[in-house]
From Swiss-Prot:
Homodimer. It is an enzyme of class 2 (transferase). This is Homoserine O-acetyltransferase. One of its GO terms (biological process) is methionine biosynthetic process. Pfam families: Abhydrolase_1. The lineage of its organism: Bacteria, Bacillati, Bacillota, Clostridia, Thermoanaerobacterales. It comes from Carboxydothermus hydrogenoformans (strain ATCC BAA-161 / DSM 6008 / Z-2901).
């Protein structure tokens, strides 16, 4: 899919304060972000990409030539790619509460000179969007061509559509929901428990200590199970075992390959993510409900004004396709412009981070339509 954006850098901007839904303020507040492409003179060719739970602002390219891995959606961003940097100005920021440069629980609280820890205020998806709005205005953007996100990123995109419709021309919500299901809340609760019962969590005041490595790893293992599908596990691992002798087989320490993979993923996250951030973002997802404090759920969905593309994944265990379809159905019932496309993939929820070649023409088509470069949508 054509060219890379090459070497990029993460930038930061600090704002005086932000007032949160809970009524508390964070002052000052810093946002880490990356941009790709150029903003046009009218300031209306911007696309906002919104990351998922353990993501960051580094969508595409590399920070150093020797980096082995590019940004998390690299095949989708660059010259000639769906998010074409010859046409669009792409922006992605680390969410409020994050641990990749934006103010979060691991940041220093200026009032104490120590990390916020669990004294950090409770944040919501709406708070994340309000901070992103500050960034968008700071960058001189007058109109966002599309707010695009998968999973927790899709939650942000939907809130953008409700909170700032005058700034937005369209929404692409991928493998997400307009309110987190009880099923999703249940898995989050178990992940939270894994972290908070680790003795090294220390009530969230673990900075300077080892930290809840085992608890965070376990939370990640639980999450990874929900991001895949039965068929993907079958294809990749089956019942392959790591034992070499019968003595090893009949032991509690022997493992199947799938177990090794889960441990690997858990340990991998521990090396790059803050446990308290994980807790705060899970809570923000739990609180996500586009109708909360606004009215009846389906009626609030009908109030969304911007053209919307919802993408579901046929094997998504965590956000089944009915959750995307109900958004589109409500909008169509209200005579709004809404489209649904289903990605067929064995990879489950994670397919939106894997199936680039399948998604590319759909996203390109929709963005070209929204930008006025084509009269119809063909998919």
């Amino acid at each position: 899919m054509n060219g890379s954006v090459g070497i990029v850098e993460t930038k930061k901007v600090t704002f005086p304060e932000i007032t949160l839904e809970c009524g508390e303020k964070i002052a000052p507040v810093t946002v880490a972000y990356e941009t790709y492409g150029e903003l046009n003179e009218r300031g209306d060719n911007a696309i906002l990409i919104l990351h998922a739970l353990t993501g960051d602002a580094h969508v595409a390219g590399k920070h150093r030539p020797e980096d082995k891995v590019a940004g998390w959606w690299d095949p989708m961003v660059g010259p000639g790619r769906p998010f074409d940097t010859n046409k669009y100005f792409i922006v992605c920021s680390n969410v409020l509460g994050g641990c990749y440069g934006t103010t979060g629980p691991s940041s220093i609280n200026p009032a104490t000179g120590r990390p916020w820890g669990m004294s950090f205020p409770i944040i919501t998806i709406r708070d994340m969007v309000n901070l992103q709005y500050k960034l968008v205005r700071h960058l001189g953007i007058t109109k966002i061509l599309a707010a695009v996100g998968g999973s927790m990123g899709g939650m942000q995109a939907l809130e953008w559509a409700y909170m700032y419709p005058e700034m937005l021309k369209s929404v692409v919500a991928i493998a997400t929901s307009a309110r987190l299901s009880p099923f999703g809340i249940a898995f989050n609760a178990v992940g939270r428990e894994a972290i908070m019962t680790d003795p090294e969590w220390r009530g969230g005041n673990y900075y300077g200590f080892e930290g809840p490595k085992r608890g965070l790893a376990l939370a990640r293992m639980i999450g990874i199970i929900t991001y895949k599908s039965d068929i993907s596990w079958q294809y990749r691992f089956g019942r392959t075992h790591t034992y070499e002798t019968d003595q090893e087989l009949f032991s509690h320490t022997s493992r199947f390959e799938i177990e090794n993979y889960l441990y690997y993923q858990g340990d991998k996250l521990v090396k790059r993510f803050d446990a308290n951030t994980y807790l705060y973002l899970l809570k923000a997802m739990d609180l996500h409900d586009i109708s909360r404090g606004r009215g009846r759920y389906r009626e609030i969905l009908k109030e969304l004004k911007t053209p919307l593309l919802a993408i579901g994944i046929d094997t998504d265990f965590l956000y089944p396709t009915y959750q995307q379809k109900e958004i589109v159905e409500a909008l169509k019932e209200a005579k709004k412009e809404a489209y649904y496309w289903e990605l067929s993939s064995p990879h489950g929820h994670d397919a939106f981070l894997i199936e680039f070649s399948k998604m590319a023409p759909i996203l390109s088509n929709f963005l070209e339509y929204v930008a006025g470069r084509r009269a119809t949508i063909n998919f």
